[in-house]
């Protein structure tokens, strides 16, 4: 099995070192420069949904998406605290990721043989994240979930370190696990892997019987998971929505996998290779620990390896998507294993070679930091500080190659004299943000290639009831719209404005009855 390294729960004599200050400065500057980044695609969708929830909408009834509620809760909280705009969303993301970096720093302060390695962890994890993310990567489920997953692992690790307080730590691990499930149900096998390692420890290291070990594990875990999930279920019960929740979160995803075409395996390979390139410094450092871990592995490192292996499996089974940001699920274990790799390299029989690889990898990471700062700094220098709407939009156009096109697409609907009120977009939800309008119906129009045929009937019914003044259909999505949807569009709407990327339709009929 694995060894158990006895450590204090937290470093009770934590002192902010010069190294900490340097890492905080780098990560803080990167976070500050990321604040005005454009909201793109999913981010815009989540913010629109979060704002609707803040205004009283009920998720899955008044605003519908197939994702579990965790991500919408995060965006609703971010908007409530800091405002429903780019600064508010990315400010919350900076605090969240900063909390992850702080937790890595504090919990692993005495784990490595050289204490300064723990100082580097926030920089290696959060610094890399802020240096390589694209607009659609930031504040996604896979980037946010690293904090509760690591919390789950650390609490389970503490149950090993302090068996006399086992129930308390496993309860907290269950709380973290419940939060993880609110982000994505598909993370359940990943969580089960972490807890299975703990169960094996109880069976083979502590020589507990199967019944005792399972009971000691499941009771506090279950009670902990009820803490975040229970209130959400009670709320939906009060809204009479348990049937809708079951259909959306349990029945629908398998149907989508069965009935919709999967992406080619080449896309998975391509996004995986892209991730390896982006995380190259951590990959090199983590690989240095490989031989050592093969011979002798402790509980925490076992959990990190399980996170990588099962995390990659969780990503691979999501055959309808395979988006690049999915691989940020692997960021935290790669950073922790990179720290272990530094530790191993500096203890090797050839320390000079180890120092060369470590310094080279950290230098590459620093170059990525500087490149990201230079890119955003140059964009701000050309567009002006984003302290007013005009400069902000100019900056975003420079940072996202598609923002000029999106701005052009909403120009017509933003002209004076247009009918105010909600609109509906079959296309990029960033158009809601740029037009400063809300979504007219509950059902989203983002990524229509992932919609079942019957869902188009739901969209038609909701549009017929709401009759928003304008509907926009992006031209690239026309091929995914079933023929039976067009008679409704042509009967109720008329083409009003062509853009290079799509068509605005204006209401031609008023609701009957």
Give the ranges of each region predicted by the language model:
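Hydrophobic, aromatic-rich transmembrane alpha-helices
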Residues: 102, 274-311, 338
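Specific aromatic-rich, kink-prone transmembrane helix
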Residues: 144-163, 169-172, 176-177, 198-199, ...
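Hydrophobic/aromatic-rich transmembrane helices and adjacent perimembrane loops
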Residues: 189, 313, 319-355
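Membrane-interface alpha helices of multi-pass inner-membrane proteins
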Residues: 28, 168-185, 191-196, 226-227, ...
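Transmembrane-helix motifs of polytopic, lipid-linked glycan transferases
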Residues: 25, 91-112, 126-127, 151
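Membrane-interface transmembrane helices that cradle and orient dolichyl/undecaprenyl
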Residues: 152-172, 204-208, 282-301, 342
